[in-house]
Swiss-Prot record:
Keyword Nucleotide-binding attached: no
Lineage: superkingdom: Eukaryota
Protein name per UniProt: Chorismate synthase, chloroplastic
NCBIfam families in the record: aroC (TIGR00033), PRK05382.1 (NF003793)
Entry's family note: Belongs to the chorismate synthase family.
A GO-annotated cellular component: nucleus
Biological process per Gene Ontology, one example term: aromatic amino acid family biosynthetic process
Range of the transit peptide: 1-50
Primary role: Catalyzes the last common step of the biosynthesis of aromatic amino acids, produced via the shikimic acid pathway.
Length: 436
């Protein structure tokens, strides 16, 4: 039987077609009495949003820029109006994140001075998109000449090529930690909103560098202060362990090597009721946000993996009513989250960061053309990322919480329930609190 070759044509309209309505190629193959059913062709419109560069639903942040481009920054959409905001409010956390602040960070020198160009009028947010920009001023593109050909082991060089077929060689482009400027700036704003609303405090600190592990019982999470954390260059609140951590970083820094570590983050006075079952549980959102940071390799909250060694009786947090009539838990192995919803206790989590992949030691690798070779990476890189990761973790936690807070108001506060079940555990509002 001879084969037929039919051209592809768009047939729009009814799916029931008589032979007279068919294209000539089909008419020759059919009898007049035959009705042929065809699936109508529908034009599909695809909407693509800066894939992978945005986070949040109600308080939405989109970051842009590359390590060795003209600059980096973000657009914040959904910020409530009438929030007092100046560039200095954002600059404090950007300074904590910036490179070149001590001998245990990258020697790249950037002031990371931010500029707000929209969304703020006379020191108050207007409710419209806020644009924040930080220029790059200390690029050294020639440091990456070898990396334009060969891939750095355990870096995103290879996977960016595999996915896109092209990559920004200088500084790693979007995979560079410099992208996190666009997270830390809106994170500072999110912390400000949370503080004004409920006195919520978010504090992160370094709890481990390589083999130096700070015992949790040495940190009083109820009374921990930012001053204790910022008292040393490694951002560990315990001076004795801080010195040990600095020594561990110095030991590998002088040899062109690197080490990893852990950042612990706590949230005090978190509003109750944040988080939505079942796929948008609060701990799931926190994990996603924190694990999106560069170099992260692990996340746990509450008792974490250690909880697997306990029985149910040992692990359960028993309830009681405190002197103010509030429902509390005597222990906090749940980490302030139960059933994916915040219960008002201190939220605590730990984020693991791998050793910096770009090191000044000889390593085996391959080129883009699959030729095996050796590489000694040049450039300026952190011997350990965790001291600078502290404000990054705080920022991501703040972005999650402020987005969840706005979602809570959108869903559950149209017809409010007993307010005592949802108010933060803090009895008095901070003096500078304003209604949002």
């Amino acid at each position: 039987m001879a084969s037929s070759s039919l051209t592809s044509k768009s047939i729009l309209g009814s799916t029931k077609l008589g032979s007279s309505s068919l294209p000539s190629e089909l008419r020759r193959l059919s009898s007049p009495a035959v009705q042929i059913s065809l699936r109508t062709q529908t034009r599909k419109n695809f909407q693509i949003q800066a894939t992978g560069s945005s986070y949040g639903t109600h308080f939405r942040v989109s970051t842009f820029g590359e390590s060795h481009g003209g600059g980096v920054g973000c657009i914040i959409d959904g910020c409530p109006p009438r929030i007092p905001l100046t560039e200095s409010d954002l600059q404090f956390d950007l300074d904590r994140r910036r490179p070149g602040q001590s001998r245990i960070t990258t020697p790249r020198k950037e002031t990371d001075t931010c500029r707000i160009s929209s969304g703020v009028s006379e020191g108050m947010t207007t409710g419209t998109p806020i644009h924040v920009f930080v220029p790059n001023t200390d690029q050294r593109g020639l440091d990456y000449s070898e990396m334009s050909v060969a891939y750095r082991p355990s870096h995103a060089d290879a996977t960016y090529d595999m996915k896109y077929g092209v990559r920004s060689v200088q500084g790693g482009g979007r995979s560079s930690a410099r992208e996190t400027i666009g997270r830390v700036a809106p994170g500072a704003l999110a912390k400000k909103i949370l503080k004004q609303f409920a006195g919520t405090e978010i504090l992160a600190y370094v709890s481990q560098v390589h083999h130096v592990v700070l015992p949790e019982e040495l940190v009083d999470h109820e009374n921990l202060t930012l001053e204790q954390i910022e008292n040393n260059i490694v951002r560990c609140p315990n001076p004795e362990y801080a010195e040990k951590m600095i020594a561990a970083i110095d030991a590998v820094r002088t040899k062109g090597n690197s080490v990893g570590g852990v950042v612990t983050c706590i949230v005090r006075n978190a509003p109750r009721g944040l988080g939505t079952p079942v796929f948008d549980k609060l701990e799931a959102e926190l994990a996603k946000a924190c694990m999106s940071l560069p170099a992260t390799k692990g996340f746990e909250f509450g008792s974490g993996f250690a909880g697997t060694f306990l029985t149910g009786l040992e692990h359960n947090d028993e309830f009681y009513t405190d002197e103010n009539g509030r429902i509390r838990t005597r222990t906090n192995r749940s980490g302030g989250i139960q059933g994916g919803i915040s219960n008002g206790e201190i939220i605590n989590m730990r984020v693991a960061f791998k050793p910096t992949s770009t090191i000044g030691r000889k390593q085996n690798t391959v080129t883009r053309d699959k030729v095996e070779t050796e590489m000694i990476a040049r450039g300026r890189h952190d011997p350990c990322v965790v001291p600078r990761a502290v404000p990054m973790v705080e920022a991501m936690v703040a972005l999650v919480l402020v987005d969840q807070l706005m979602a809570q108001y959108a869903q559950c506060h149209l017809f409010p329930i007993n307010p005592e079940l949802q108010e933060p555990l803090q009895i008095e509002q901070p003096q500078n609190a304003t209604a949002l």
